[in-house]
């Protein structure tokens, strides 16, 4: 019975009006001082990343290896987004985040 119900729900979903949702995930790479020495520091990557997100107009995007300062930079550059997530070390701001950003 449960399987039949699931099949009916899935079939009925195809009748509903579909809406496109643009979703992506991106490994930001943490803010590492050695990257800056090699010319690939966060200061160089942030504008490229935020321009890419703005250009593609993502509805939702996930990010990995995000330090708090990087999160703040992304939010400042992308005011049309908010996020859900916490730093993994203390459940607040310490450690890397894996935030999910969504359009406000």
Labelled PLM ranges:
Residues 1-21:
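Bacterial Sec-dependent N-terminal signal peptides
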Residues 1-2, 32, 103:
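Serine/threonine-rich low-complexity intrinsically disordered regions
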Residues 16-78, 88-97:
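N-terminal, active-site-proximal structural segment of metallo-dependent hydrolase catalytic domains
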Residues 97-104:
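A well-ordered secondary-structure block
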